[in-house]
A protein has these predicted regions:
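Juxtamembrane intracellular "pre-TM" segments in multi-pass secondary transporters
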Residues: 1-6, 188-219, 403-409
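Short amphipathic helix-loop junctions that connect adjacent transmembrane helices
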Residues: 29-46, 235-251
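Central cavity-lining transmembrane alpha-helices of secondary-active solute carriers
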Residues: 51-67, 258-269
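Conserved MFS/SLC helix-loop-helix module at the cytosolic interface between two early adjacent transmembrane helices
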Residues: 61-98, 275-278
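Structural signature of the two symmetry-related core transmembrane helices
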Residues: 78-93, 172, 282-297
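Paired small-residue
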Residues: 90, 101-109, 294, 305-313
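Cytoplasmic helix-loop-helix junction between adjacent transmembrane helices
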Residues: 106-144, 327-328
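Symmetry-related core transmembrane helices of the 12-TM Major Facilitator Superfamily/SLC fold
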Residues: 167-183, 373-389
Length: 409
């Protein structure tokens, strides 16, 4: 990488650290925050936790391709700054809400600007040589993972000591800081000498995706993966309450969230390097099967620390899925359309984020927590099977020639 690109990676690592840390500071106790608005039944809280999670991603699902295209045309740096400011403002105002509807509407507003981390991936991806894309994207992800690791525990401590409202205010300050950091980056686009087209119409981008069946499959299973991953998020703190009790609940829920982040942090960069060497699709299939197998025991634990251990082992596998997926898109999509392709990828991920929390809330409300883990496990294994079948059916398209991959741009 060029010196300016390395500097950008360094800055965006810290920006992602602050954004991810800030977002996960409040995620573990959204359901607990809703409980403070009135005397509600457990089923009511579980259902509204799911809807409040999901509404952010409804807006993000609609706006992600738009932001991606704007980024391709006018620069991703501007989009990153707007995203940070929009998220920071909405989270700041969440500290003043008095009803679940007010929280719901602010989460909707936040969704319009959500996408800082995916946009930062596009920002760095376009200035990264293809042969090291997995390692670089894995390195970038360690920033958000480290933030995610520290965020829940810090959020739990702040919530227990100062209350939920003050935690939202501190969270917004961190996100505003991330937007400020972006000002010190320099936008660079590493053009391939074979890429003569400098811009593509939306129709051309969609046709490119359709004509590359493995790329299309990777984008589509992004939704399934997120359905699986986010189905547990809204009810994890309630599950911790069942296993551990209500004492210092926000703190212990934060630890459960962070355990997955620790495993993720340890392996994200390593999975990227492995995929650079052996092929992104093959490693992605392996990771999906492993994640499915590791998720299953979570529904049958009998104490809190068993859940923490399982969350850690799950994080080891989940850590590679996003950087490997982004690196594959970097390889298959021309630079001039990468923002929009990644926008569709992000949009489908957010679509999964819409379905996942609602599904998790409904399943846990009617069938119990264990059923959520079983469903999640099956969805991840199904995603791996779909990608495996697609790879076998389109071998020539899916094949990743190491010599081709290692050619410098």
């Amino acid at each position: 990488m060029k010196p300016d690109s390395k500097r950008n990676l360094f800055i965006m690592w810290f920006a992602n650290f602050f954004v991810a840390g800030s977002m996960t500071m409040v995620l573990p106790f959204i359901s607990l925050y809703i409980e403070t608005f009135g005397n509600f039944s457990a089923t009511y809280v579980q259902h509204w936790s799911g809807w409040t999670f999901a509404i952010t991603f409804v807006a993000a699902f609609l706006f992600s391709p738009i932001w991606g295209r704007i980024g391709d045309l006018y620069g991703r740096k501007k989009i990153l700054i707007a995203s940070g400011l929009g998220m920071g403002l909405s989270i700041f105002l969440m500290g003043y809400v008095t009803s679940v509807w007010q929280l719901f509407m602010l989460r909707l507003f936040m969704g319009i600007f959500t996408g800082f981390i995916p946009m930062s991936q596009a920002f760095i991806s376009t200035q990264t040589p293809k042969n090291i894309a997995g390692k670089v994207m894995g390195t970038l992800q360690t920033g958000s993972i480290t933030g995610s690791l520290m965020g829940p525990m810090l959020g739990g401590i702040l919530a227990d000591q100062f209350g939920f409202a003050h935690t939202f205010k501190w969270t917004s300050i961190s996100i505003f800081l991330s937007a400020l950091l972006v000002l010190f980056t320099r936008e660079i686009i590493l053009q391939n000498k074979d890429d003569k087209i400098t811009s593509y119409s939306s129709k051309a981008v969609i046709l490119h995706i359709i004509r590359h069946p493995i790329l299309l499959t990777v984008l589509l299973i992004s939704a399934l993966i997120q359905v699986a991953h986010f189905s547990i998020q809204p009810i994890l703190s309630l599950y911790v309450s069942k296993l551990h009790g209500s004492e210092n609940l926000a703190f212990f829920a934060g630890i459960a969230f962070s355990a997955g982040g620790l495993g993720n942090l340890m392996m994200a960069r390593q999975w990227g390097k492995i995929a650079d060497r052996y092929g992104y699709i093959k490693i992605l299939i392996i990771l999906l099967f492993m994640a499915g197998l590791f998720y299953l025991p979570g529904g049958f634990v009998t104490n809190y620390w068993q859940l923490v251990i399982i969350r850690f082992t799950l994080g080891v596998t989940i850590g590679g899925i996003i950087p490997v997926r982004i690196a594959y898109i970097r390889q298959e999509a021309p630079i001039a359309m990468q923002g929009e392709v990644l926008g569709y990828n992000t949009s489908l991920r957010f679509f999964g984020n819409i379905i996942g929390p609602v599904m998790g809330g409904l399943i846990s409300g009617y069938f119990g927590f264990s059923a959520v883990f079983v469903t999640t496990s099956l969805l991840l294994i199904l995603s791996g099977l779909i990608l495996l079948l697609a790879m076998n059916r389109h071998t020539q398209v899916a094949g990743i020639n190491l010599e081709k991959k290692r050619m410098p741009l």
